[in-house]
Amino acid sequence: MQHQLVVKRLGRQDYEPVWKAMHEFTDQRTEETPDEVWLVEHNPVFTQGQAGKAEHLINTGDIPVVQSDRGGQVTYHGPGQLVAYFLINLRRKKLGVRDLVTTIENLVINTLKAYNIDSAARPDAPGVYVDGKKICSLGLRIRKGCSFHGLALNVNMDLTPFLRINPCGYAGMEMVQVSQFNGPSDVETVEKQLIEELVTLLDYERVEFSTEAPSQGNKA
């Protein structure tokens, strides 16, 4: 199972049902459960991470705010943004948390490089940046040696809701996206490149694709 990966393409989804399904998957997985990556575009929502502070919500207006249990502070999700959730058994992969963060950042950097977009990570603020402007946010949670939550890569979206918050707790943090650097404007194209890079970086040999929505069981 160490080299097997299931990739689920979930399409457009509200945040909370997917969040609850991630919890359930992580709670129920065993040592034999293959790792999964869930690819999704969320309907408009602000999510507060565990370090989130109310003062970073400037004017949320009609966009809902959800208190999440991922690391980090506030961010925005909306259509045209690629969200990837990494449900990985870190012990089985022999990865530490810092290793996983670095791997995810490199995953995005390599994906953007395929479109001739030069980007970099920052030691003081997780995520990926182009000329100091944020193109990808990152927030994770670890339970029972397994990760959940993940990244949000801006592809071709309305960035104005980011002006209603201090993204990731940084006042004036400018957000950018793939399409403005002559990269693809459709999320699906970027998804394919991202998964190719992930399979290489984390040494998966068997990859199964699915559009089946994750089960939420009886959780409310």
UniProtKB/Swiss-Prot annotation:
Keywords recorded for this protein, A-Z: Acyltransferase, Cytoplasm, Transferase
GO molecular function, one term: lipoyl(octanoyl) transferase activity
Residues binding substrate: 70-77, 137-139, 150-152
Entry's Gene Ontology BP terms: protein modification process
Recorded family membership: Belongs to the LipB family.
HAMAP family, A to Z: LipB
Additional free-text comment from the UniProt record: In the reaction, the free carboxyl group of octanoic acid is attached via an amide linkage to the epsilon-amino group of a specific lysine residue of lipoyl domains of lipoate-dependent enzymes.
Protein name, entry field: Octanoyltransferase
Organism whose genome encodes this protein: Vibrio parahaemolyticus serotype O3:K6 (strain RIMD 2210633)
